[in-house]
Amino acid sequence: MSKITFPKDFIWGSATAAYQIEGAYNEDGKGESIWDRFSHTPGNIADGHTGDVACDHYHRYEEDIKIMKEIGIKSYRFSISWPRIFPEGTGKLNQKGLDFYKRLTNLLLENGIMPAITLYHWDLPQKLQDKGGWKNRDTTDYFTEYSEVIFKNLGDIVPIWFTHNEPGVVSLLGHFLGIHAPGIKDLRTSLEVSHNLLLSHGKAVKLFREMNIDAQIGIALNLSYHYPASEKAEDIEAAELSFSLAGRWYLDPVLKGRYPENALKLYKKKGIELSFPEDDLKLISQPIDFIAFNNYSSEFIKYDPSSESGFSPANSILEKFEKTDMGWIIYPEGLYDLLMLLDRDYGKPNIVISENGAAFKDEIGSNGKIEDTKRIQYLKDYLTQAHRAIQDGVNLKAYYLWSLLDNFEWAYGYNKRFGIVHVNFDTLERKIKDSGYWYKEVIKNNGF
């Protein structure tokens, strides 16, 4: 097989999120987040796990940066815990929380690692949830206030910014299915939440521009390609609708200033029509510097008149594929097709893959190594498709591998390992897996 080489300025990174790695949930003045409350409620998280300690990154960030340097990570994408900065979501600033992120950012820079900050990765201050959370439009203003503090303190040294991580997951899993914090199960609420998340993105981008910050800003969506189960018109239409609800519902407002028609029509049929000031979409769709997405898998969709939405997963197709430990199918071509779709339908934007990776059951072997060959194969296959898209003219600028560390995988607790670095959750000892050493070579050679 011929060698695959990426463009010379391609950014090789890895990613984490505050609640999944930091621990120190009640230290140095940090306020309670909705994930603290949710994980402390029995029955919400597998095995009663919580993020109270997680990887203890809050106390071990120096060691973690050493590991990044050893692997050769060029850029590290991390999120800031809003309740560390504003324990009540608004009002009194917690200087100790801010100082932690300043130390972290400066140490990354000293080690030649480019910091990339996500402003919101799901850990809303509980005090704001008590006032209605993301369903309450006021939260978008509190978010702007919080963003301003971060921009003021880190804007001149951080080159890459993400407003939100996966608003679709916050809306769907947090407010419709109720399996993520804050555990609400209501369709109308989930749609109002999705709108307010996007509105807060727009407000933060507007502020970022007004502050003349010399850096790039975008948003990280969760996207997968939705394939029709067959060439029948009804399956094709079902897959298009499914992708509209999960993908275009976020892509279109941000990049086109409107919601997709087929999705609006479906919600109208269910008796739900969103009402909001007409300026909202103008705010939401301000120009961004790149569109980012997290991609792990693909969907196969069939027409299903018995389902509420008129479609369902094509299980007979899905069962043919190899799956990761999350039960997600491994289908690398889906990444290529998704990149081509974004390039074609949204005017050749700059694109960042903000997360990609796989969970497998990793164990330290008798030789002391973690031989995660399945993960290496997964990464190789997905990166091959990313490279293929670049060859075909897609403006893909960066790749952030999920994740640097094994961590708290939300409702699954510590049972799903995504890291290229193994974490023993009893001793908190870190150990680079074979995939970490493989990634080191990829970065060094700018390909494989």
UniProtKB/Swiss-Prot annotation:
It comes from the Bacteria. Keywords: Carbohydrate metabolism, Cellulose degradation, Glycosidase, Hydrolase, Polysaccharide degradation. Coiled coil: none annotated. The active site is at E166 (proton donor), E355 (nucleophile). One of its GO terms (molecular function) is beta-glucosidase activity. Pathway: Glycan metabolism; cellulose degradation. It catalyses: Hydrolysis of terminal, non-reducing beta-D-glucosyl residues with release of beta-D-glucose. One of its GO terms (biological process) is cellulose catabolic process. The keyword Hydrolase applies. The keyword Hydrolase applies. Its EC number is 3.2.1.21. It holds the Pfam family Glyco_hydro_1. One of its GO terms (cellular component) is cytosol. It is an enzyme of class 3 (hydrolase). PANTHER family: GLYCOSYL HYDROLASE (PTHR10353), LP05116P (PTHR10353:SF36). NCBIfam families: BGL (TIGR03356). Belongs to the glycosyl hydrolase 1 family. This is Beta-glucosidase A.
